[in-house]
């Protein structure tokens, strides 16, 4: 396996996480769902470029995120490659990235994926999930921890992330596994909406 550089993540993640917590004061729910060791895939919805930092607030473990290859250019690409990020080509996991992700998981590390494949700028709650997360889970026997990011990306406006219970998809049909993951993320988003509505009614 080609060594994946991570020194930039180790250096910058604590700083970025600290600043995000000060500015946005996000509510982080059920972060104990992420085990302190073992191979894990974190998978959830995607709205903004800040999402990887927000997800990383839930664990001290280093997360190898997958990102579009178009971001791997110039200065930004330099930093992303040294933050342990793996490129995704044309909306699909490139075979080299897929192999790298498998190797990372087989070393009992953490991979982060946004199964929508892009940031969701629509009014829809979720875009259709691509199958990269469940495919990796089945290839490596990894559990998937779904997460849902909810709220406005403005300072002090109730931004939150909730991690769900780990799901196992190793013995499932790929299509059914992908639907299960999407359903679990949707449940977390629905829960956040209900809680937000309840808070408004109390005012």
What are these regions (language model features)?
Residues 21, 36-92:
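Catalytic core of membrane glycerolipid acyltransferases/transacylases, capturing the structured
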Residues 28, 73, 95-98:
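Structural motif corresponding to alpha-helix initiation and N-cap regions
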């Amino acid at each position: 396996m080609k060594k994946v550089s991570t020194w930039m993540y180790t250096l910058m993640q604590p700083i970025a996480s600290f600043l995000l917590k000060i500015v946005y004061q996000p509510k982080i729910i059920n972060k104990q769902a992420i085990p302190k060791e073992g191979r894990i895939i974190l998978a959830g919805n995607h709205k903004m470029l800040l999402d990887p930092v927000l997800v990383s607030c839930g664990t001290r473990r280093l997360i190898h995120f997958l990102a579009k290859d178009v971001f791997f250019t110039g200065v930004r690409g330099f930093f992303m490659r040294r933050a342990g990020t793996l490129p995704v080509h044309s909306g699909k996991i490139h075979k080299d990235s897929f192999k790298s992700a498998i190797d990372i998981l087989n070393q009992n590390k953490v991979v982060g994926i946004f199964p929508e494949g892009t940031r969701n700028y629509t009014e829809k709650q979720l875009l259709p999930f691509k199958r990269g997360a469940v495919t990796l889970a089945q290839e490596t026997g990894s559990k998937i921890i779904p997460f849902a990011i909810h709220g406005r990306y403005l300072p002090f406006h109730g931004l939150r992330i909730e991690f769900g219970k780990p799901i196992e998809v190793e013995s499932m049909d790929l299509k059914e596994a992908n639907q299960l993951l999407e359903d679990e993320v949707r449940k977390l988003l629905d829960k956040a909406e209900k809680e937000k509505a309840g808070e408004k009614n109390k005012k």
